[in-house]
Amino acid sequence: MPRLALASVILFLGFAGGYWFQRPAGGGDVAALTEEVSELKEMMMLSLLEKESATDRLRAVSLTSELGKASDKVTTALFSTLNNDPNVNVRLAALEALIPFTSDSKVREGLVRSIAFQDSPLVQVNLAELMAAMQEKKSVSELKKLAESDRTPKEVKEKIKKSIEVLI
């Protein structure tokens, strides 16, 4: 019986010691694993953006919300999608995905440049409203060009002019 008690105490001390000595190292492992998962999500997002299916591209854009912060690669891919994707829903999703990063001046400048690329009334109106919400005065000249274009629908012109009024 004393041997069993001694073995139990040694076993308990072994587990307690192992737990005690492994704790600090475990935090570093978790941080490294979190970083790897983030990198994998970024790679998956970039890969999905190149797919033909609009559903895959929408899934890729939605993955950005799971990334802690966006790298230059991610924001560049989102701008490419916003400016060039044939599907309006994917472009709108890319615009929405960029909103959390508007504190970055590069993102704000990219959004202003994107105004000239848009032919969809939905994207045009959303960009104009975003510019007004951000108080991005640098966008006024691009918005005026859009409002004066013959290709811009009348209702869209009215909304863009309201956004310009907010900015001026």
PLM regions and their residue ranges:
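Conserved hydrophobic register position within alpha-solenoid helical repeats
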Residues: 59-63, 94, 126-127, 157-160
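Eukaryotic acidic, Ser/Thr-rich intrinsically disordered low-complexity regions
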Residues: 148-168
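Short inter-helical turns and helix N-cap capping residues of alpha-solenoid HEAT/ARM repeat scaffolds
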Residues: 52-53, 85-87, 119-120, 149-153
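Amphipathic alpha-helical scaffolding segments comprising HEAT/armadillo-like alpha-solenoid repeats
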Residues: 34-48, 69-82, 102-116, 136-148
